[in-house]
Structures are given as C-alpha cells and as structure tokens.
C-alpha cells in the first residue's frame, strides 16, 4: 500500500492511541511487524506546542519507518500551523483526527464532533493539505450516531480536498467502544472513493484481519487496542495473510524479553519517575493472561524505582517458568 510517495512494507498500521503510542511503543510495534505507526494525538492549540508533553509526543527524524503524526483541533488556521510545525520537525505524513469520541475533545468541536459539520471538515482538510508538502490522511468514525452515519459523504469530501488515505473505525461516536464494530459502512465507502481505505475496529487476531480485508475490500488495517500488551500481533497477522497458517503462541521467554526491553525503553525515554508510572499500564496489559489474579500487578504498581521494576519482572518470570 502507498500513501502519497511512501510505500508501506505491509498493510498493517499501529493506531494512534492517546497515552499509548509514544515513541517506545511505536518502535516496538514497527519491530514486531507493523508497516507503519502513527503518533498519539497532538493538539493543534498553539499554547501547548512547546510543553514537555507535546515535545515528547512529536516524532523525530531518526525514528524508524514512515513517520506519521496525528493532529486534532477545530480551527483550520491552527490545524494548518500544527501540521507545518510537525512536518518541519520530521513528520512524513500528517494524520487528522476526526474520530476521537472523548467528551473533552468533542466539547471543543474536535475529534468525531466534526463529523456533524461537513463544511468545517472541508475547511480544515483543505487548510492542512495546502499547508504542507507531505501526504495528509484522515481518521474518522462511521458517523455521529447510528442514525447519522455520514462516512460516505465525508469520504467523498476528503478525496476532493486532497486527502491521500482514509481510516474508518467501524463505530459511531455515540457507540464509543461498546458493542461490535460494523464493516458494512467501510465496505460502502471503499466502493465510492478511489483513495486507499484503512479499516479499523475490533481487529483482534489473524482470522479477523483476513475476514475484514476480504469483506470490506480495504487496502489496509489499523490495529489499536489489540496491540496493547501484544505488539507481536502484527507479526502474527502478517504471517497468516502471507501463508494462511497461524503462528504458535509466543514462548513465555520471548514475552519476557519483549516486555523487559519495552520497560527499559520507557525508563530511558521518560526518566525514572514518569517512566515507572507509564510502565505500569503496559506491564498490566502484557500480564493480563499470565497473572489473572492481579496479585503481582498490584504489587508491581506500588514500585517507584525503575531498577526495582525490572528486578520484580525478572523474579516474576523465574517463578512463572518454574511452575
């Protein structure tokens, strides 16, 4: 699949997830087989551009793979400026968020709230496309509510504005993450536009990935929550798409190696204090199926020191492997 001048190594993309897809996680997903990763959402509000939080979220020119940054906002001028700043800082693709269902985002008429205002959508898309020399992509939901599904209208509008790929999450804003994603809307969009379509929502395993590609005709898949604590899902899916065979479960020793490397990189990237706090949620996701009683996770979450976190993980796996 191509986005503008960029050829992805495969059709699997790691979704932008606030508080999750930081640089260490993006690098890990890329190493584990993702064809591209997208940064967590960056606000277009100029008042926050120079904060430590925003600087950590930006991509840098030394990152591996195609560097895509997602921006969010409702002011066309601010969005264009944010796109230019990120492109100048190393972003090779700018992704526009019109799919986030969070209330705090929607209250500012950003994220999926924009789907109710096609005229403003067109202004924002045109402003961003005209502001940068890199490809611009868009991520949306199928609409505001089941009674207001307008993804086909938005897709056609996006194509006219110069958007070079469109990701669609198979739920409306009203649905949040409840129930199951539906793919009929994605299939219909694919039949009505010529730009690449990326299907998103509930793609949890290789069989589901194959089924969604076949049913929707999508050019690529975007995988989000299923990669939390299981970044090797990209490798599993790609192997199945290539061979029709499922890989065996990842050996626990390899899970340990991946997790400990990830935790070390979080410590290095954020520093000991913030790094240890952020590591807690990732370790919880990794160990979901291995520590169902939560006992280890509770004790791990009380650890404040980075080296103690790594020692605790080492001891946990030693005990686990002895069982």
Curated annotation (Swiss-Prot):
Q: Pfam families recorded for this chain?
A: Dus
Whichever gene encodes this chain, its name is dusB
Protein family (similarity comment): Belongs to the Dus family. DusB subfamily.
Give the residues annotated as active site. 100 (proton donor)
Q: Which UniProt keywords apply?
A: Flavoprotein, FMN, NADP, Oxidoreductase, RNA-binding, tRNA processing, tRNA-binding
State what this protein does: Catalyzes the synthesis of 5,6-dihydrouridine (D), a modified base found in the D-loop of most tRNAs, via the reduction of the C5-C6 double bond in target uridines.
Which InterPro entries does the annotation name? Aldolase_TIM, DUS-like_FMN-bd, DUS_fam, DusB, DusB-like, tRNA-dHydroUridine_Synthase_C, tRNA_hU_synthase_CS
Q: What is this protein called?
A: tRNA-dihydrouridine synthase B
> So which cofactors does this thing need?
FMN
Catalytic reaction list: a 5,6-dihydrouridine in tRNA + NAD(+) = a uridine in tRNA + NADH + H(+); a 5,6-dihydrouridine in tRNA + NADP(+) = a uridine in tRNA + NADPH + H(+)
């Amino acid at each position: 699949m191509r986005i503008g001048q960029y050829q992805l190594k495969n059709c699997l993309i790691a979704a932008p997830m606030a508080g999750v897809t930081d640089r260490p996680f993006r690098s890990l997903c890329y190493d584990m087989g993702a064809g591209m990763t997208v940064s967590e959402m960056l606000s277009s509000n100029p008042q926050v551009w120079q904060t430590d939080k925003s600087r950590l979220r930006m991509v840098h020119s030394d990152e591996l793979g195609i560097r895509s940054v997602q921006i969010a906002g409702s002011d066309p001028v601010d969005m264009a400026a944010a796109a230019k700043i990120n492109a100048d800082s190393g972003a090779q693709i700018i992704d526009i968020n019109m799919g986030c269902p969070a209330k705090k985002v929607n209250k500012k008429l950003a994220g999926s709230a924009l789907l109710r205002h096609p005229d403003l959508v067109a202004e924002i898309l045109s402003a961003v496309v005209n502001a940068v020399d890199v490809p611009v992509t868009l991520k949306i939901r199928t609409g505001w509510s089941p009674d207001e599904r307008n993804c086909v209208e938005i897709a056609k509008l996006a194509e006219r504005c110069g958007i070079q790929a469109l990701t669609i999450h198979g739920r409306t804003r009203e649905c949040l993450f409840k129930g199951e994603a539906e793919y009929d809307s994605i299939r219909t969009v694919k039949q009505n536009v010529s730009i690449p379509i990326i299907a998103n929502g509930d793609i949890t395993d290789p069989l589901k990935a194959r089924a969604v590609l076949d049913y929707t005709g999508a050019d690529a898949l975007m995988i989000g929550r299923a990669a939390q604590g299981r970044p090797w899902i990209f490798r599993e899916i790609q192997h199945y798409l290539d061979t029709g065979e499922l890989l065996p479960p990842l050996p626990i020793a390899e899970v340990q190696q991946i997790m400990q490397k990830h935790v070390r990189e979080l410590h290095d990237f954020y520093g000991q204090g913030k790094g240890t706090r952020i590591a807690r949620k990732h370790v919880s996701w990794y160990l979901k199926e291995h520590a169902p009683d939560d006992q280890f996770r509770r004790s791990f979450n009380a650890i404040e020191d980075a080296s103690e976190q790594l020692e605790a993980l080492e001891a946990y796996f030693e005990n686990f492997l002895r069982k």
